[in-house]
Structure formats: structure tokens, C-alpha cells
Amino acid sequence: MEKQAKVLDASVVVKWFSEEENSDKAINLKESYLNGEIILIIPILTKIEILNALRYKKNSEEYLKKVNEDLENLQIKIAEINNNLLDKAVEISLKYNLTIYDSIYVAIAQLYGCQLITADKELFKIPDVVDLGKI
């Protein structure tokens, strides 16, 4: 049986490093990945968003560098951001009135034919987007 791929946005991945609502569910997704049960896909943008979010939570430089290293060591599949993906993101952004940043995640999920899991309420209006709190 082929492993299911899932796109995670930064609102989910940041919960691996910061105790928040539904952090347990986010960590369960990471554990499923580490156990080889699922494939995780993120754009490189995710790492930037996570480090930025954690920076504003008053974390130290040392901690932020450790998070960056931990993310690298996980070897999560990084979706290439190319013109095809950006064109799809623009289309989604205009259709649903989203930022291009958020639309990138939706576009990746659509192009890979898999679920996007998010804790971002703004994305719940998109068909086939999964609320982290409901998994």
C-alpha cells in the first residue's frame, strides 16, 4: 500500500516546537512520518515562517538555530516552488481571497493530489483542506 502524502503548513509544524492548542495532534503527524506511515510535504517557505513565528515568541538565537537544524534533520520533502506552482497559487489566492503565502500550501496539495492540514481558520473555506483540530 502506498503511503499517503500530506502537506502541512507552518501553523501545524510550529506546534512541534511551541506548546499551543492541538500541539498533540501536530506531534502525532510528525510521529506518523517518523514511523514511515505517511509522507510530509512542505515548501521551503514553511521553515522561514516557523523560525519567524518562534522568533516573535521571544526564543533565543540558540533555540532558533536548533529548530532549523531539527527541521533539516527530519528530511521532510520540500516542494519545489516553480512557475507552475506560483500560477496555481495566484489562481487560488484570487479565487478565495488569500495571501499568496497561504495559497502556496493549497496549490502544493492540489498539484500533489493530497490533503493540506492546517490550523489556520482562513484556509478552512477551501475544499479538501483539513482542520488540524478535527483529525
What are these model-derived regions, one by one?
Residues 1-42, 57-69:
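Short, well-structured N-terminal submotif of metal-dependent ribonuclease cores
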Residues 12-13, 46, 85, 105, ...:
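Alpha-helix capping/helix-boundary segments
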Residues 1-5, 79, 106-135:
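Acidic, PIN/NYN-like endoribonuclease modules and their adjacent C-terminal/linker elements
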Residues 9, 102, 120:
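Acidic active-site catalytic centers that drive phospho-/nucleotidyl reactions
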Residues 35-37, 73-74, 112:
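Structured helix-beta-strand junction loops
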Residues 77-115:
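Active-site neighborhoods of divalent-metal-dependent phosphate/nucleic-acid chemistry enzymes
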